[in-house]
Amino acid sequence: MNLPNGHVLQNGKYRITHVIGQGGFGITYKGVWYTEVKGSLGTVQTEVPICIKEYFFKDYCYRETESFAVKVHSETGKVLFDKFKEKLIKEAKILSEVHHPHIVNVLEVFEENDTAYIAMEYISGCSLKYMMDREGILPEPKVLRYVRQIGEALQFVHEKNILHLDIKPSNILIDSSGKARLIDFGVSKRYDIEQQETSTTMLTLSKGFASIEQYDNEGTQSFSPCPDIYSLGATMYNLLTGKIPTESILRATRPLQKPSELNKDISP
């Protein structure tokens, strides 16, 4: 289903090295970008490690063996595929203009093989989810530092009327310098100056991290930073306790246990 190692895109500009991950809406590859760097010694050709996301709607698509083109099983599926491909391209182009030290940079969005690709900065590091799986509950000072950094990233995108809508530990990378970087704007929404939604989005709910507004189709039609703030708080709870919070839609009948009851080492 994925592109083979060594496959080239954009007439040789990018080369796939291997698959990093795969989800319901796409495949993520590590690759290299062949580019030129100008300096005191002249122009030097170099290879820059990058990350490439391929839009691949797993439940609706298949790949042709010889051409590597992505095809859709049915006409109904093609309507959905095309709709969300256009949304992905639109949002990726917006994000290519958004540069912040705690957000992974988008280099380019392009179409090939009858689908869409996003070339992004490659971050050497691991996600907070992987870090937790490996180390267990994280120390409070470290959690506060990461949450503060992602909060700065969210403030930046919120000022541009963009909601991320999928904040969770697996979408926060910690790079080799220890800096938190927000990734995966695949279900994000952008709003106009009147704070009305200008793009549709794929319905994706990360249970325990999604705000109650995200369970209602009309809950995110108008801009509000609340869904992202809630999800960042839920992420903080998870990092400090090791527990995924009660789903927001169930909180009225299933109270959330206090973090200090689950982790005696954190501030009350």
List where the protein language model places each region:
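Protein kinase catalytic-loop region centered on the HRD/HxD motif
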Residues: I150-I162
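C-terminal lobe helix-coil module of Hanks-type protein kinase domains
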Residues: G208-P268
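Protein kinase glycine-rich loop
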Residues: T17-G23, T28
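Activation segment signature within eukaryotic-like protein kinase domains
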Residues: Y146-V147
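Conserved short submotifs of the Hanks-type protein kinase catalytic core
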Residues: N113-S127, M131
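AlphaC helix of the eukaryotic protein kinase fold
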Residues: Y62-E97
